[in-house]
């Protein structure tokens, strides 16, 4: 698909590709796990594929034929997933991923040399702002931009676990994966909103009122 997107971009210049962070690091072996719950928690569309496909996705990000990395975050609980016991088609479709998108991408992208820090910023922020015609108000550090910023610590480390995540769901598809590179602070319109994982600020800014 990434090859087709690349060719279409050359012709129409209006075709965009977006892999999910889950597909960059997880593969179809997740569905063969002996624990039914483990497999069902990872049911999503498109489903995970053979691990060999991941090289093509990374190459698409490197070449620019794939523009941004998303999650399709759907926080279905294990109990909700169990609606599909006995009928696969009734398993709610989707997984979590929003909280871990950037640390996993930094670790597996920048940490392995697949992406540069600038490419990381592009596929997590700048490119989507441009696609949605929100640039340079969003996706840029410029005078007049909204100052929605993440202060990143490339040396900070953690092991991903459902027991310590912010999400209220009872599992994490990246459980046990070690990541190096974490957000320290998040600013919304120039005001510190999150620090070291703690939410500080929820009031709307004057522009939002």
Predicted features and spans:
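C-terminal cap of metal-dependent C-N hydrolases
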Residues: 83-87, 143-198
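Flexible loop/turn segments at secondary-structure boundaries
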Residues: 7, 23-27, 76-79, 130, ...
């Amino acid at each position: 698909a990434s090859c087709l997107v690349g060719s279409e971009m050359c012709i129409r210049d209006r075709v965009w590709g977006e892999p999910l962070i889950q597909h960059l690091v997880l593969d179809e072996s997740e569905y063969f796990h002996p624990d039914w719950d483990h497999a069902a928690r990872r049911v999503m569309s498109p489903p995970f594929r053979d691990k060999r496909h991941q090289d093509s996705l990374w190459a698409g990000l490197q070449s620019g034929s794939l523009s941004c990395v998303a999650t399709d975050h759907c926080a279905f609980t294990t109990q909700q997933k169990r609606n599909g016991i006995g009928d696969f088609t009734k398993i709610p479709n989707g997984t979590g991923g929003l909280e871990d998108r950037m640390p996993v991408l930094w670790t597996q992208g920048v940490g392995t040399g697949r992406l540069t820090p600038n490419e990381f910023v592009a596929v997590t922020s700048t490119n989507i702002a441009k696609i949605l015609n929100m640039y340079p108000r969003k996706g840029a550090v410029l005078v007049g931009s909204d100052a929605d910023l993440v202060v990143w610590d490339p040396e900070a480390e953690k092991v991903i676990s459902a027991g310590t995540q912010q999400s209220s769901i009872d599992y994490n598809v990246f459980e046990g994966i070690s990541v190096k590179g974490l957000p320290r602070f998040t600013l919304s319109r120039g005001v510190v909103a999150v620090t070291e994982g703690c939410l500080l600020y929820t009031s709307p800014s004057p522009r939002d009122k």
